[in-house]
Structures are given as structure tokens and as C-alpha cells.
């Protein structure tokens, strides 16, 4: 079966990879000149289903807990399994108790244990929650590696094109995300803003979430002394540059985590529109010969593998073939 996948963000790339591994003939098309040009490129890359359960429905945990294994199988060496640390400032320590009641899979840490995990946070927080089973990856590196793997496998990847003709394909899988807002019923945009900083004065080994009643943030370590700080959530489909207010909120929160971030160089700011359905859960829907994969909201890297698996199951069932294990 010949499949056209439109959109080379995290949804399109994972779908293309999964279908290729199942033996489908896949063409991947992307309007932009690069992969991950939309919201996927501004993601944190946290594979954190237990933490996300704090404000998400149960499927985020049940589907998302398989994501780290999927990414490790597809891209060996790209997944960092170091857990997630969740902290709160002195006046906000009650947020930790609230967070613990709404999640599972954590263990309490005292000051000594925090310092053992993250020496640069020694003495800054009295207690923390540690989600040992969680992981993270660098989104842009992962997307580029997935695209390179598909090209090495001689799968057709076309970038910077308006759109491939679907006439020569048996099925189309649309993974164009926010481009479908206003077209797919119930799909809306949620704006997310982030920034990247660079400093040699702070070292972190894992994502750290700083809880706050109004402005919770996370900081994800990257390579070369870089950190991604995110992310706002605004009910809007405005994809324009980051606002001054959001920039100040993110920088102030990073400074509250460690004052050395006040001297960090801001190397990038960005904003993306995350497509979401009313329940904030992704869906695979069908419209004629087209399957739509959309609504990944803030869970792109966490839930895209599960959505790719669902697409593969549907197409294999249509062909009358049993699903075989694919990475």
C-alpha cells in the first residue's frame, strides 16, 4: 500500500517511521524547507507521563509511558533516562503536596538527596518530588535523526513543496497540526512560548519543574551548556513572536530556580501553536481516503508514538494483515 504522509513534525515523522517499519511504501511531504518547522521545533522533549498526569487525563499516562522505549528503539542513544525533578520555592511548597496528590510514580527527596542528584541546586530547595522513570530528549536532534534515518532507508522525503499529489497514493495521512484549525471540528490552538539560554554557571542533568500557582515552568538541559525554558500556555492560535510579558515570566522563574540564570545569554526565543481538541487528547480520525492525526496539544513527543501505532493498526487491518512488532 502506498501512503502519503503530509507534515514533517513529530506526528508525521513518527507515523512515517512506523509505517515504513511495517513495510508500507511511504512518501513524506512537508511545506517548510525543514523538518520540525512548526510547534514540534519548540517542544521541551520531556517524556514525562507521570508528571503530565497532574493536569491531563488518564490516557496521557497509559499511552505515554511507552514513549521512551519507542524513541530509544527508533533512535538509540537519543533518550536520556534520568528522571524529572519537581521543586517549589519556599512560599509555594504547598504546590508540591498538591502535585503529589494528583500524580503517581514519585518519591520524596530531602535537601541531601536533591544535592546528590543536582549539586547546583544544593541548599536551594528543602524538598522535591523525583519521578525516576521519566526521560527526555532533544526534539530538534531527534526529528533530524528520524528524517535522516528515513532518507537512508530510501523513503521519499520532499521538503519545501506545496503538497504532493495524492492521486498516486492509496491513502493519505494528514499530520499538519495547527494548519487544520478551523477545518477539523473542535480543533483549537494553544499558544506556547519558550526561550533558550546558555551559561556555564549552572549544570543540570535532567528536566527540573518549578511549581508556582500562576507561572509554573520547566527547564530542560541541552548540550553545550544550553537550557530550554518553557513554556507558557495561552488559549490563542497566534503564532507571532514571544511577548514581553511571557519573556519576563520565564526569565524571572528561571532566576528563581537559580540566580546564575540571570547572567545567562538568551540565545533564542520562540512561539508555536499547539493543536488541541476540547479534552486535550489526540485523535486519529478518518475523512474519505485520509486519516487525520491531530490534537497532540503539549504532548507531541510523548503521545506521537501511540498515534503512529494506531495509524499502523488501522492500515494493517484494512490490508488484512496482522500487526507485527515495529520500532
From Swiss-Prot:
One of its GO terms (molecular function) is oxidoreductase activity. SUPFAM superfamilies: FAD-linked reductases, C-terminal domain, Nucleotide-binding domain. This is Putative thiamine biosynthesis oxidoreductase ThiO. One of its GO terms (biological process) is thiamine biosynthetic process. One of its GO terms (cellular component) is cytoplasm. It comes from the Bacteria. NCBIfam families: thiamin_ThiO (TIGR02352). Gene3D superfamilies: D-Amino Acid Oxidase, subunit A, domain 2, FAD/NAD(P)-binding domain. Pathway: Cofactor biosynthesis; thiamine diphosphate biosynthesis.
Amino acid at each position: 500500500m502506498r501512503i502519503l504522509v503530509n507534515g514533517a513534525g513529530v506526528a508525521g515523522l513518527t507515523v512515517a517511521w512506523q509505517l515504513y517499519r511495517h513495510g508500507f511504501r511511504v512518501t513524506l511531504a512537508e511545506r517548510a524547507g525543514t523538518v520540525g518547522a512548526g510547534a514540534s521545533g519548540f517542544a521541551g522533549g520531556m517524556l514525562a507521563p507521570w508528571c503530565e498526569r497532574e493536569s491531563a487525563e488518564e490516557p496521557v499516562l497509559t499511552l505515554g509511558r511507552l514513549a521512551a522505549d519507542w524513541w530509544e528503539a527508533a533512535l538509540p542513544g537519543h533518550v536520556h533516562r534520568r528522571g524529572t525533578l519537581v521543586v517549589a520555592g519556599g512560599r509555594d511548597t504547598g504546590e508540591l503536596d498538591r502535585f503529589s496528590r494528583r500524580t503517581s510514580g514519585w518519591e520524596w527527596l530531602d535537601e541531601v538527596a536533591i544535592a546528590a542528584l543536582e549539586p547546583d541546586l544544593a541548599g536551594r530547595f528543602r524538598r522535591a518530588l523525583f519521578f525516576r522513570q521519566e526521560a527526555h530528549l532533544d526534539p530538534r536532534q531527534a526529528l533530524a535523526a528520524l528524517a535522516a534515518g528515513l532518507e537512508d532507508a530510501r523513503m521519499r522525503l520532499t521538503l519545501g513543496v506545496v503538497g504532493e499529489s495524492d492521486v498516486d497514493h492509496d491513502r493519505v495521512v494528514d499530520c499538519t497540526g495547527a494548519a487544520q484549525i478551523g477545518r477539523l471540528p473542535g480543533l483549537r490552538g494553544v499558544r506556547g512560548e519558550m526561550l533558550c539560554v546558555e551559561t556555564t554557571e549552572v549544570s543540570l542533568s535532567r528536566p527540573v519543574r518549578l511549581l508556582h500557582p500562576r507561572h509554573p515552568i520547566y527547564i530542560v538541559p541541552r548540550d553545550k551548556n544550553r537550557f530550554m525554558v518553557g513554556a507558557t500556555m495561552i488559549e490563542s492560535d497566534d503564532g507571532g513572536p514571544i511577548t514581553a510579558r511571557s519573556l519576563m515570566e520565564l526569565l524571572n522563574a528561571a532566576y528563581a530556580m537559580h540566580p546564575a540564570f540571570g547572567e545567562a545569554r538568551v540565545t533564542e526565543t520562540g512561539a508555536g501553536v499547539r493543536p488541541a481538541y476540547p479534552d486535550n487528547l489526540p485523535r486519529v480520525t478518518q475523512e474519505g481516503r485520509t486519516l487525520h492525526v491531530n490534537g497532540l496539544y503539549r504532548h507531541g513527543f510523548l503521545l506521537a508514538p501511540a498515534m503512529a501505532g494506531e495509524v499502523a493498526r488501522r492500515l494493517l487491518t484494512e490490508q488484512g494483515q496482522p500487526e507485527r512488532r515495529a520500532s
